[in-house]
Every structure is written in structure tokens, then in C-alpha cells.
Amino acid sequence: MGLDIVLVAACALVDVDGRVLLARRPAGRHLAGLWEFPGGKVEKGETPEDALIREMSEELGITIAEPCLAPLTFASHSYPTFHLLMPLYACRRWQGVPDAKEGQELAWVRPNRMAEYPMPPADEPLLAMLRDLL
């Protein structure tokens, strides 16, 4: 029998200067200290878009409308205890100023500098796609 599939939605928030928001996983969490695209698990009955709208509010205190979420690509990666399926969306419009609500560090990063930020194995393949599209 294979690994359980965990569906996580992630968002590349892109500001007016073309920088992407990365969040550093806080101490005590799985993959602590690594940088990632904000997002979270898709709960039962949610679409990935619904999950992102909820997670962006909970984690960053911002409001996103579903039409502002553009699907970019996805990651499919096996960890030792589960298989991660992660659609990545881009968003250039939101309301509010992103603020770390869950103890995470935030950084606005130019796409050509994202490789300097250590990321989970599932996120790393997404960087080339982002550099090409942004």
C-alpha cells in the first residue's frame, strides 16, 4: 500500500516590484527553519482555492478573492511518511499588509534570489517555473 496523499495549497504572493513572499517555518514544526510559499492543508470539503483564502487570512492577515488566484504549477513529492501534492497559485492582488500571525519570519524575495533560501524538497522544483514566469 502506498503513502497517504496530503493535499496542500500554496501561494506565490507577488508584490508590485515583482518580489515573492516567502515564510520561514517556525521552530518546533516539521521542516522548521526552511522557507516556503505561504499556504496550508486543504481540509475536507474545501477546494484548494478555499484553503488558500482561509490560510492567507489565518497566517498573514490578508484577504484574497478567488478570481485573483492564478494556478501556476504543482509539486508532487514523497516524504518518508506521506506523499505531498501541492498546487501553487500566483496572486498579485490582495487586501491588507501581510503580517506573520503564526510566529513565522517573512521575506520578500526577487525570483532570481529564491534559491538562496533553503526550502523543503517539494518546493525546490517550483523555483525555476517561478523565475521563468515572473
Which residue stretches match the model-derived regions?
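Active-site-adjacent beta-strand/loop module that shapes the phosphate/pyrophosphate-binding cleft
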Residues: 6, 15, 73-98, 107
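Generic C-terminal helix-cap and adjacent flexible tail
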Residues: 1-3, 131-134
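NUDIX/MutT-family hydrolases
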Residues: 88-90, 98-130
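Conserved Nudix-box catalytic region and its N-terminal flanking loop in Nudix hydrolases
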Residues: 19-59
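A short coil-to-beta-strand element that immediately follows conserved catalytic motifs
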Residues: 63-73
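Conserved N-terminal beta-strand and adjoining loop/helix that marks the start
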Residues: 1-20, 41
